[in-house]
Amino acid sequence: MASKCPKCDKTVYFAEKVSSLGKDWHKFCLKCERCSKTLTPGGHAEHDGKPFCHKPCYATLFGPKGVNIGGAGSYIYEKPLAEGPQVTGPIEVPAARAEERKASGPPKGPSRASSVTTFTGEPNTCPRCSKKVYFAEKVTSLGKDWHRPCLRCERCGKTLTPGGHAEHDGQPYCHKPCYGILFGPKGVNTGAVGSYIYDRDPEGKVQP
């Protein structure tokens, strides 16, 4: 039974479909949610199950501020501060509050765990190793937080970059050869990543 395209909600037939984020799309419906640029299956970032181009849209909207995690979408541009009256010159601090600050000593810096809670809340669990993923070591892909070494191709174990890979049933795969061999539509060139698959002979050997 043909599935429905999540963008236009119309039926997607085999000859016109591309698969990404666990869904079947019309080729021209797989577009960036922000700038509407046409995307290729697996060759894009995602957030909350929706596709985004890596740059500038994903990086601008969702990349961690000031932290380069080495993956796609690892930068974000700071938004300007909300407009309001700017205060110039020294700010007067009441004497009582100044004395209170002296008594309590200098403010303590946040611990590693508390800083994680401040930015991300309770740490998520890595879908690969089932251990907690802290902010400084995480990469985000397929709507989940992973340890960087845990984001690997399900078939060959190659380490992947966030958004820079294909996916099937919520699992990451490298584009070539794994996704193409396992899931690419046979004999149909959709012009997208992972659009070819090689038939296997009865003995299990891959035929070009």
UniProtKB/Swiss-Prot annotation:
Q: Which UniProt keywords apply?
A: Acetylation, LIM domain, Metal-binding, Phosphoprotein, Repeat, Zinc
**Region Disordered: which residues?**
98-119
* LIM zinc-binding domain location: 5-57, 126-178
The answer to whether the entry has keyword Iron-sulfur is: no
Q: Which InterPro entries match?
A: Znf_LIM
Taxonomically, the superkingdom here is Eukaryota
A cellular component term, taken from the record's GO annotations: cell cortex
Q: Subunit arrangement?
A: Interacts with TGFB1I1.
Protein name (database record) = Cysteine-rich protein 2
Output the lineage of the source organism.
Eukaryota, Metazoa, Chordata, Craniata, Vertebrata
Gene name, per UniProt, is CRIP2
